[in-house]
Swiss-Prot record:
Catalytic activity as recorded in UniProt: 6-phospho-D-gluconate = 2-dehydro-3-deoxy-6-phospho-D-gluconate + H2O
Pathway listed: Carbohydrate metabolism; Entner-Doudoroff pathway
Binding locations of [4Fe-4S] cluster: C156, C223
Protein family (similarity comment): Belongs to the IlvD/Edd family.
Cofactor, how bound (note): Binds 1 [4Fe-4S] cluster.
Name listed for the protein in its UniProt record: Phosphogluconate dehydratase
Superkingdom of this protein's organism: Bacteria
Leading EC class: lyase
GO molecular function terms noted in the UniProt entry: 4 iron, 4 sulfur cluster binding; metal ion binding; phosphogluconate dehydratase activity
Length: 607
């Protein structure tokens, strides 16, 4: 057994110690559910008859309690490009299950929002809380007691974390994530940036912008940038919840179909009546969560996962915080550059070696815990292999080779950066996260006057009026989970990018979120405590000097201490109801802080 890197070992040990009581309570829960919870043998005849009434040819199998019944929770809709392929999955999966003597039922559906559609719109204020709704819907779906295993169909931003948060309440069930894959590549990313900035400057019209956007987002599958959706897939791969190499195979291909078939066959093998029982609650543990953070840092993944990973972990009784991310970032090298951290997209990453190469390199550097349980029989080492179809059309896995393009992937011995993509900033403004992997190091330290806003639309107005044509740190506050649901502010990126290109020192500080697609412009985000909770960001005034320094790990308002301490907090803007946002008031009231995952449904749930 090779030695684990000392920092990874140290962080893992403290996560285990910090989680000792909560993890024990969780394991006790899933053991109880396995032994005494509701399952088919414990249902009444009437319960069972209702459960398989519409199943036609599968009824005999469903009456046989020695056969595995897999509950599918699907996030299908055909507005969300990544989820459109799931239209075909349930019927295909039923066929695949019958091949191994099992059955499949659609246990339920969950909503799936597209942040690309709601970006900059009122619906974005429901986006983060949709994760909690998805968790609740997943729990409802699996509550019928008809299933010995689960298959979760989800890809995008809040959907995968929500599915896992709900499924972990049924952690005694073997569970697999079944992805659909990325869309084929559209226009070059540099061209996308150029046209968006031209539009922000008023140099082209809406038709030209829409033509570009439609050429970029043009088919079924995930968006091809390395944002939150594709970071989800990386995390699932490192957690061992996919069939190895499933993450980035495009939809509608023979390999994609073969991987879906293999996923159904594999979860059917994992029931507790067999000899390879692997429940979800044992796969997600302290060590696998640390591995997920390592994967995030090594690939420059989405900042949203500084909330999603803690939220998922907490559902399994595991407690992580931003210090864990920061300490791991100091020793985990950046070995992948995928847009927005570089010019190449997720398909080019896959063709260059993809997740198999990333995991191979991280294992070789002893940066991953090896003693973890995965869906794959051989453990985490199996994820250092890439899937392929042999000449007979059979699914096989081949060891990862060398990267096909060193502008996308590099070995640990020659990384893009010696440390990871995310940094913790601290100071008299609170704690915040910073995505260093997407920002030119010359912008890692910025000291400038602030311009304070409480609404992203007002930032756009100020930009168009020329009021931001100077060195400026734009502050957008009252964007935290308890204020308005913590929307993403990605709509501001083109305007801030124009200012940066014009030679100004510019940055953004916010208690809100930014899209996983955000890059280039320095952003201190998820500032905690948030403004509504009395956070110091609520004290800032126009003209205050703020210093952001990645090297120093600082986020400071350079205001004399006596004056700073005496300042009152700004008042929260009036809430504007509409588009259903008013229905989420109970979520806003109960949301945890960003560092704890900004989860509302855990309050009072003993989680």
């Amino acid at each position: 057994m090779t030695d684990l890197h000392s920092t990874v070992e140290k962080v893992t040990a403290r996560v285990i110690e910090r989680s000792r009581e909560t993890r024990k309570a969780y394991l006790d829960l899933i053991q109880y559910e396995r032994e005494k919870g509701v399952d088919r043998p414990n249902l009444s005849c009437s319960n069972l008859a209702h459960g398989f009434a519409a199943m036609n040819g599968d009824k005999p199998a469903l009456r046989d309690f020695n056969r595995m019944n897999i509950g599918v929770v699907t996030s299908y809709n055909d507005m969300l490009s990544a989820h459109e392929p799931y239209y075909r999955y349930p019927e295909q999966m039923k066929v695949f299950a019958r091949e191994v003597g099992a059955t499949v039922q659609v246990a339920g559906g969950v909503p799936a929002m597209c942040d690309g559609v709601t970006q900059g719109q009122p619906g974005m204020e429901e986006s983060l809380f949709s994760r909690d709704v998805i968790a609740l819907a997943t729990s409802v779906s699996l509550s019928h007691g008809m299933f010995e295993g689960a298959a979760l169909l989800g890809i995008c931003d809040k959907i995968v974390p929500g599915l896992l948060m709900g499924a972990l309440r049924f952690g005694h069930l073997p569970t697999i994530l079944v992805p659909s894959g990325p869309m084929t590549t559209g226009i070059p990313n540099k061209e996308k940036i150029r046209i968006r900035q031209l539009y922000a400057q008023g140099k082209i019209g809406q038709k030209e912008l829409l033509d570009m956007e439609a050429a970029c987002y043009h088919a079924e599958g995930t968006c091809t940038f390395y944002g939150t959706a594709n970071t989800n897939q990386m995390v699932m791969e490192v957690l061992g919840l996919h069939m190895p190499g499933s993450a980035f195979v495009t939809p509608g291909t023979p390999l994609r179909q073969a991987l879906t078939r293999a996923a159904v066959h594999r979860v059917a093998e994992l029931g507790w009546k067999g000899d390879d029982y692997r429940p979800l609650g044992k796969i997600i543990d302290e060590k696998s969560i640390v591995n997920a953070i390592v994967g995030l840092l090594a690939t420059g993944g989405s900042t949203n996962h500084t909330m999603h990973i803690p939220a998922i972990a907490r559902a399994a009784g595991v407690i992580v915080n931003w210090n864990d991310f920061h300490d791991l970032s100091e020793v985990v090298p950046l070995i992948a550059r995928i847009y927005p951290n570089g010019p190449r997209d997720i398909n080019e990453f896959q063709n260059a070696g993809g997740m198999a190469y990333v995991i191979k390199e991280l294992l070789s550097a002893n940066l991953l815990n090896r003693d973890v349980t995965t869906i794959a029989k051989g453990g985490i080492e199996e994820y250092a292999k890439a899937p392929a179809l042999n000449d007979a059309g059979e699914l096989v896995w081949k060891p990862a080779g060398e990267p096909g393009d060193d502008t996308i992937l590099r070995p640990v011995s020659n990384p893009f950066a010696k440390d990871g993509g995310l940094r913790l900033l601290e100071g008299n403004l609170g704690r915040a996260m910073y995505k260093a992997s997407a920002v030119d190091p010359k912008f890692w330290t910025i000291e400038a006057p602030v311009r304070v806003f409480s609404d992203q639309d007002d930032v756009q107005k100020a930009f168009k009026a020329g009021e931001l044509n100077k060195d400026v740190i734009v502050v957008v506050r009252f964007q935290g989970p308890r204020a308005n649901g913590m929307p993403e502010l990605h709509k501001l990126t083109p305007a801030l990018g124009v200012l940066q290109d014009n030679g100004y020192k510019v940055a953004l500080v916010t208690d809100g979120r930014m899209s996983g697609a955000t890059g280039k412009v320095p952003v201190a985000l998820h500032v905690s405590p948030e403004a509504l909770g009395g956070g110091a960001i609520g004290k800032l005034r126009d003209g205050d000097i703020v210093r952001i320094s990645v090297e120093e790990g600082k986020l400071e308002a350079l205001v004399p201490a006596d004056e700073w301490n005496a300042r009152p907090h700004a008042e929260k803007p009036a809430f504007r109801p509409g588009t259903g946002r008013e229905l989420f008031d109970i979520f806003r009231q109960n949301a945890a802080k960003a560092e704890d995952g900004a989860v509302a449904i855990y309050a009072g749930a003993g989680i």
